[in-house]
Amino acid sequence: MRTADWIKKKAHEVVYNAGTNNPMKICEENGIYVCHQNLGRAFLGHYTNIKRIPLITLSAQNNEFEDNYACGHELGHHYCHHGNNTEWLSRNNLRFNTMGSEYEANLFMVNIMLEGVDFSEFETKEQLFKSCGIPLWAERYVDFN
């Protein structure tokens, strides 16, 4: 299990090296393939490796907002080295995880998407999250200190 500090440092490193905190652009900069498939409405995305080639599959039914955070979540699986045995990100499992690979992936997602953002520029958490493309259910993963 990775620590929250390790994940935050890794997210900073990834954003710094890619020159962006946009999950889709991070994939592009790092040779991580992203494709869209018909996964139905229940699933948002999945991460896997095919012959050591990283691949993020996003649902063709996702909107742009869902693609963005699902991609960030799946990047968490890639950079936290979870391998191929991760859960599919589903609309039904967007609950708060306190440990394990889903917790780490969610923590990584919010850390890359908030990297370099000055929280004081926003009056409410909702404004901050909307501006950064983070879903409200992910608030519990954000360290506001």
List the predicted regions and their residue ranges.
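Active-site hotspot residues in diverse enzymes, especially metal/ion-binding acidic/histidine motifs
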Residues: 1-145
